[in-house]
């Protein structure tokens, strides 16, 4: 079976741990130091449900920065990881507008996405409950929701694997090479 490519975009406010989640998933290391991202792209080959997948993961700047570039990320992305920090309410409140922007740019109501409450290892500093995350996911049309910790490797792989499964359900890949090459035009 051929390798299928997936374009995933990680979005959220500055400091929520987008890079930490991405680097933990791709390289298996936790980045302790906060170094604001402009844009980083990572590739990782994984197997999900028996399918070989090449993920191209775009780790973006915080939503408050580089807004002009964001429409382009959204246009090209097939699936989105929307990240907030469970210890910062403002990062949670930013997500509905971000989701609306994705739906507007994609011109679609059904876009594969996972809502992620990051930094669940800091439970004693929590200001956003798991129930609030669940409720927001329901408001987002029942999108997937996970709490994660890049530091402790909690739910990191599940975020990306769930997104791959959503993309596959929405847009199954070709079942054979002939089908992939088929196409054509109709002359009228």
UniProtKB/Swiss-Prot annotation:
It is found in: Cell membrane. Keywords: Cell membrane, GTP-binding, Hydrolase, Lipoprotein, Membrane, Methylation, Nucleotide-binding, Prenylation. GTP binds at residues 12-19, 59-63, 118-121. InterPro entries: P-loop_NTPase, Rap1, Small_GTP-bd, Small_GTPase, Small_GTPase_Ras-type. This is Ras-related protein Rap-1. Gene3D superfamilies: P-loop containing nucleotide triphosphate hydrolases (3.40.50.300). It comes from Physarum polycephalum (Slime mold). GO terms for cellular component: plasma membrane. It is an enzyme of class 3 (hydrolase). Pfam families: Ras (PF00071). A motif (Effector region) lies at residues 34-42. Belongs to the small GTPase superfamily. Ras family. One of its GO terms (molecular function) is GTP binding. Its EC number is 3.6.5.2. GO terms for biological process: Rap protein signal transduction. It is a lipid-anchor. Residues 186-188 form a propeptide. Its main location: membrane.
